[in-house]
Regions:
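Glycine/charged-rich beta-loop-alpha catalytic/anionic-binding loops adjacent to active sites
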Residues: 2-11, 51-59, 257-268, 308-318, ...
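Flexible, glycine/charged-enriched surface loops at secondary-structure junctions
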Residues: 36-43, 84-89, 111-112, 197-203, ...
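Signature of multi-pass transmembrane helix bundles
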Residues: 105-261, 425-437
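Acidic-glycine-rich active-site phosphate/pyrophosphate-binding loop
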Residues: 1-4, 38-52, 242-261, 293-311, ...
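Conserved phosphate/anionic-ligand binding catalytic regions in large, soluble enzymes, centered on
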Residues: 12-28, 264-281, 323-326
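A structural signal for small-residue-enriched, beta-sheet-centric alpha/beta enzyme cores
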Residues: 13-17, 48-55, 138-142, 147-163, ...
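Hydrophobic alpha-helical bundle architecture
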Residues: 36, 286-299, 303, 309-375, ...
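Early transmembrane hairpin of solute transport permeases
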Residues: 23-126
């Protein structure tokens, strides 16, 4: 089940996953249009949930100077092949990219807010020659639930759950939340897993692919160039080049490249490339800094990604809170393990993370995501260093509880119910009593 969860929640993507989901939906609609008899796309209408619009508004389109969901929709509709899923824009020829850009500049692409209960919802309607194609993606970034040609459904799984609507190997958030605990993840990664022989290819890919995008981010001035600037600060003596700063440099550089639209793939975690980078690269950086062998590094990276997946299962695919805080909590656990920590120390590390960076808001996917990631990675290294010494935020403080699972549930509640004072106070006043032996 652990490998199935990893394969379900980790996948290749190019660029930000929200524009990717828009492009995929548009590609499905465009393909339906062509089957209905339409030729050259004349107009595109996108209706999406607020969270999708927020995260797609300022994100760069891979391999172009464009940004935003209108370009993603046009590119997907004009030249996208839905078989490529979240990498759909990677395979669109330059001529069709230019055709799509012309549609946007001519005002032929409209973006509207969809009044729907789902946080992840994209609907695209494409028209040409009196024909229409329509597609809907919902709940998961690649979960296509409806495709229509001239109003006639050729695929309709709107009343099915995400696993039924998409790949049969998809594991639902409810299944993940029920199966994964910090204890079960720890036992699997440290005792049951054989990293060199078990089929954890997605973890190996995450290390390789996300290292590539981090190196890309250090090679050029992408976005705010947080990784390169941290590196420069070290060379100038403004910062110390230590384990923590090294992890910050490597993780933020990957996000620099991704948010700027570098045409380089990433292995995402829970639908987010930045979370994939954040859950993987600080752990890889720490392992290499400490000269840790590959087997232990793979255990640590698996631990990190599974902890992030466990949190996101209740946190929500898209949220008002920054997903880097979730992924960095996973990274902190992986780092604590590499520093010699056991299960108790990993639990202390989680308590330190929730007691520190909880509440960082998500105000869209954009260049300064790399800045937030560097902050979260700094916190992760600090939390791990404290945790391996048994130092932890106490259950008398804030939303931290005596049991790490309750703490993570409180963390998720802030994501799903908002971060108002009333919600925070309610969590503080209604903590679980410690169990007695």
């Amino acid at each position: 089940m652990f490998v199935r969860i990893l394969n379900s929640e980790m996948e290749l993507a190019t660029g930000c996953t929200e524009p990717g989901a828009v492009a995929l939906t548009a590609a499905e609609a465009g393909a339906a249009l062509r089957k209905a008899g339409g030729t050259r796309v004349e107009a595109v209408t996108v209706r999406a949930s607020i969270n999708i619009i927020k995260n797609a508004m300022s994100a760069g389109i891979p391999g172009t100077s464009y940004q935003g969901m209108d370009y993603a929709a046009a590119i997907g509709a004009v030249g996208g092949d839905p078989v490529h899923l979240l990498e759909v824009m990677n395979y669109v020829p330059r001529e069709q990219m230019e055709e799509a850009a012309a549609l946007v500049k001519a005002g032929k692409v409209k973006v509207e807010v969809a009044q729907v209960p789902q946080k992840l919802y994209v609907e695209v309607v494409v028209t040409a020659d009196g024909h229409t194609g329509r597609a809907v993606v919902r709940d998961l970034h690649t979960n296509v639930v409806l495709v229509e040609q001239d109003g006639v459904a050729t695929l309709d799984k709107q009343h099915a759950g995400p696993a039924a609507a998409g790949d049969s190997d998809v594991v639902t958030p409810e299944q993940i939340a029920e199966f994964l605990t910090v204890r079960s993840i720890w036992d699997y990664c440290t005792e049951e897993l054989d990293p060199l022989h078990d089929p954890i290819d997605i973890i190996r890919s995450a290390v390789q692919v996300n290292t590539t995008i981090s190196n890309e981010g250090l090679s050029k001035e992408y976005g705010l160039a947080i990784g390169r600037n941290l590196e420069l600060n070290c060379r100038k003596g403004l910062m110390t080049r230590d384990l923590t700063t090294n992890a910050m440099v490597i993780a933020s550089a990957g996000a620099d490249a991704r948010m700027a639209g570098a045409p380089v793939s990433v292995v995402a975690n829970s639908g987010s490339g930045n979370q994939g980078i954040t859950a993987t690269m600080p752990v890889v950086a720490t392992a290499r800094w400490l000269d840790i062998d590959e087997e232990k590094m793979l255990r640590a990276v698996t631990l990190s990604n599974l902890i992030a997946i466990r949190i996101k299962a209740k946190f929500g695919r898209l949220s008002n809170l920054c997903g880097a805080t979730v992924a960095a909590t996973g990274a902190a656990c992986g780092i604590a393990y590499l520093l010699g920590g056991g299960y108790h120390e990993v639990c202390c590390t989680i308590q330190n993370m929730v007691g520190n960076i909880t509440g960082m808001v998500c105000d869209g996917a954009k260049a300064d995501c790399a800045l937030k990631i560097s902050t979260c990675v700094n916190a992760a290294c600090q939390a791990a260093a404290m945790g391996v010494r048994g130092v932890r935020v106490q259950s008398t403080d804030g939303i931290v509880e005596h049991n790490v699972e309750y703490t993570l549930d409180n963390f998720a509640t802030l994501s799903t119910n908002g971060t108002s004072d009333s919600v925070i106070l309610d969590l503080m006043l209604n903590k679980h009593l410690p169990e007695t032996d």
